[in-house]
Amino acid sequence: MPPLTDPERSRCYLNALANWRYDGFIVFMKDAVRWLRAELPDPSLRELGRLLYEHVEANGCTCVDEQIETREGWRDRHPFHHDIRMPVAGRLIYFETRLIYRDPGDPDDPLIQVVNAHDA
């Protein structure tokens, strides 16, 4: 799977993750929340945001897979989705995310939606 190497999207992705302490920058959507609460009741969603940030910060955005969105119903709204596989609580977890931004020059503009999570 191709890594996230585009400089603008990489910067925006890391900027969104860097704001993990604040509401609205990493948004866990209902399907991801449902699985995470059932399978990994600890850590909290905020803690998962911190772990995602630390993982990408330590390994660079090339640890994030960038997929061209081809699925019906999504490809018209999102050109890409981004996948992260990382250890959490002794398990390898897959996170499917969407990067949303309008102003790549504003570090507080981008946000990430975590739309799915499951064992990798």
Annotate the PLM regions.
Residues E57-L111:
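Functional cores of ribonucleases/endoribonucleases
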Residues M1-H78:
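Compact soluble domain cores
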Residues V114-A120:
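Short, solvent-exposed aromatic-acidic interface loops
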